[in-house]
Amino acid sequence: MAVKIKLQRMGKIRNAEYRVIVADARTRRSGKAIENIGIYQPKQEPSLIQIDSERAQYWLGVGAQPTEPVLALLKVTGDWQKFKGLPGAEGTLKVAEEKPSKLDLFNAALAEANNGPTIEAITEKKRKAKEEAEAKAAAEKAAEEAAAAEAAKAEEEAAKAEEADSAEESAE
């Protein structure tokens, strides 16, 4: 029985994901597999390639023929060079940067929250109370200014009257 290592398409439309499978050469692309030995997700940046090296070496050793796309993947992971005994068995696989764990993100947010909020949370009641307090303060300030203006006016009139009295006394 001729055995091939090929890609089996999975995933949604325009979001292709593949399984690297070992199957009879006569089966269709999405047919029954003998063994699933890896995954390939070309839409990620960089592409995700995970192939079980031990199982790939076994199947290549017993005569399974890789298809052209799988051969390219095996060369990237270094499994083909290892099988053929060529230099460069480490491959040229690019690894994505590790995402920060959710626990680290949570701890960072918690530390930031412990520093205290930069502004107060404003609810409707607090907003109305604040507006009323501001309006009351503005009214009081206006009343104080008006009272101060009246007092200044009264003092000015008193000073004028005093000047007039002193001028009359000096004239006599």
Curated annotation (Swiss-Prot):
SUPFAM superfamilies: Ribosomal protein S16 (SSF54565). One of its GO terms (cellular component) is small ribosomal subunit. Coiled coil: none annotated. It comes from the Bacteria. GO terms for molecular function: structural constituent of ribosome. GO terms for biological process: translation. Residues 129-144, 152-163 have a biased composition (Basic and acidic residues). Transmembrane segments: none annotated. The keyword Membrane does not apply. Residues 125-172 are annotated as: Disordered. Belongs to the bacterial ribosomal protein bS16 family. This is Small ribosomal subunit protein bS16. It comes from Corynebacterium aurimucosum (strain ATCC 700975 / DSM 44827 / CIP 107346 / CN-1) (Corynebacterium nigricans). The lineage of its organism: Bacteria, Bacillati, Actinomycetota, Actinomycetes, Mycobacteriales.
